[in-house]
Amino acid sequence: LLAHTLLIDDTRSIDGYSPSWQRWFAHVGVPFNKNTAFKRFGQSNMVIQAALAGQGIALGRSALVVDDLISGELVIPVKKAFPSGFGHFLVSPKNRSRNPSAREFCRWIKMQAELSQTKIHWLLRDCFAKV
């Protein structure tokens, strides 16, 4: 892996827990080589596009790359997942919780999230088993 160009998303989260190659290598117990070739990008989608174009290997958020992995456009070169600890929450004002449109939207978004989670779990089942 260290012989390849590593693609970096320079976007930083507020809490400082954005995935990074240094953290990934520490997570899997491999010494990080600072002489490794890097390409830096300012947005997650640019990193994904660079990986799709064959410019290097990227750390990708599973929800953003799951369809590319399923289609075979991208592959998982190392079966070691790195859980980010990020989560999503669906909230609404209390006075709108009875609104039929809001309830329907909540039902739909939960269904989409469950479908996405099912795809991700199926795709990454071997990655998490070996961590």
Predicted regions and their residues:
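Generic recognition of short, well-ordered alpha-helical interface segments
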Residues: 16-20, 45, 100
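Structured beta->alpha junctions
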Residues: 10-13, 39, 81, 94
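Secondary-structure junction motif
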Residues: 6-28
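Tryptophan-centric aromatic hotspots in well-structured domains and transmembrane helices
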Residues: 18-24, 41, 61, 88, ...
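C-terminal effector-binding regulatory domain of bacterial HTH transcription factors
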Residues: 62-67, 71, 79-131
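Hydrophobic hinge/microswitch elements
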Residues: 31-76, 83-84, 98
